[in-house]
Amino acid sequence: MVRGIIRIASLASVSLSSSGFFLYGTGYWDPSDFGVVRIGRAVLTTAAITWDYFTKLRHVEAGTEEYENIKSQVHLRSAHRLLDLCCFNRGTFIKVGQHLAALEYLVPPEYTKTLSVLHSQAPCTPFTDVVQVIREDLGKEISEVFEEFEKTPLGAASLAQVHRAVLQDGRKVAVKVQHPKVQAQSSRDILIMEVLLHVVKKIFPQFEFMWLIEEAKKNLPLELDFQNEGRNAEKMSSIVSSFSFLRIPRIYWELSTKRVLVMEYMEGGQVNDREYMKRNQIDVNKVSHALGKLYSEMIFVHGFVHCDPHPGNVLVRQNPENCAPEIILLDHGLYQVLTESFRLDYCSLWQALIAADKERIRIYSQRLGAGELYPLFACMLTARSWESVNRGIYENTVSKEEIHEIRSNAATYLPEISQLLASVPRQMLLLLKTNDLLRGIETSLGTHSSSSAFFYMSRCCVRALARHRKEKADSLWSYIHISLSETFCLGQLQMYEIALRLQSCIGRWINHVLLWLYLQ
């Protein structure tokens, strides 16, 4: 057990160190700009965490109250060490820390709570550097562009920070300014990461992490181009314009460059802030349902997916006109465009998962690169045990025992998970990350995927597959037949959902009657 914990802690730290390739340096002297300092800090952190687990737990009997108390204390100390490492090395270390903080169904709470500050409270760039970036990119002083400009940022992330400002005409805006030391270091950092990954492979031969650098090479230039982010925001706004609950800030192109993005200012609370929702009378179930609906549409119908929905990028507020919850989607730098063949196979796989069709789960998992590890792949996609997948994930809710089982088994299957990540299409990697972040939000809200979410997901899959078949139809009769089949399937789903709701209502009514009779 101790070895397993040490292994997990070591891998967490090593993964952070091997992911640390967004380093800062443009001529400003900063100790954290030097690779040897960053690597040394990561190695020391890994060693300290490993030694802490080993020395504190090896002489304590596993499963006892004393063991659990000591383990919790070590978790907390280790989490603070990881937080310090993220803040010192910045860049992707912060990105990885944000991701860990969202994995509340998998990572111990001591880690998620400690690292959650990275969602919006990452280390900030000094205001003088912010002024310099705006001066260089816009060719003007801040006072020439803005009537007001708050020196303290609203939030800071791995690549940039956001300030509230007011334009000369009185419009309130949010100004996203890239950290000045990101661009110049990126190429050298990727090289450093390659070296670190080879070292990791020497230590853990069974693990394959080279997909990390492949994704970095592809995504880093896109995330560093804020004009690309602006285009993504406008495209997403157009694609899901029918969703009245979604708000995406307007981009002010005349004031935006590759390093500066000026957009409409929108207020809201973070999507995982239950206290904020309680104060503002926002229904957490409606928020969770809307978020699931939005991402089902993105993934299955359009194949254009916002892949960084950590809580700092998803805000909620109440519509003052109808009191309905609204979702504000921020940070559109990281998107995954799914190929048609991948998207259709993914649709078919989720239909099989929802229907608990084991044979089709095997077929479509293997088509997506899972091979004989398809049961593990299904568990990773659903965050459910294989037993629950076989029973039907929409028919049985996740229990505390199942969550504990998943957490306990995660370490056991780390080599297989690594093998799986190395074999699936690159498109799948960001989808898995997105799924993890969304489930982390669900866990924070206490709203694990409901049957209604699965019904909407099923409808999206039916629509997507039918649209593809209609595009390939070679006759009018074939087109009509596909359309009728689509309508019939959607009608079946609607009737089944209504039946389940009625069953639920009747069950609650019977419970109330029985309780009333008991109290008489």
Swiss-Prot record:
**Amino-acid positions noted as binding ATP in the UniProt annotation, renumbered to this chain:** L154, G155, A156, A157, S158, L159, A160, Q161, V162, K176
* Residue stretches spanning the membrane: none
The cross-references to PROSITE patterns, in alphabetical order and at most eight, read: PROTEIN_KINASE_DOM
Keyword list (alphabetical) reads: ATP-binding, Kinase, Mitochondrion, Nucleotide-binding, Serine/threonine-protein kinase, Transferase, Transit peptide
Name the residues annotated as catalytic in the UniProt entry. Answer: D308
Q: Where in the cell is it found?
A: Mitochondrion
The residue ranges of the Protein kinase domain are 148-455
This protein's name:
AarF domain-containing protein kinase 1
Phylogenetic placement of the source organism: Eukaryota, Metazoa, Chordata, Craniata, Vertebrata
Q: Which gene encodes it?
A: adck1
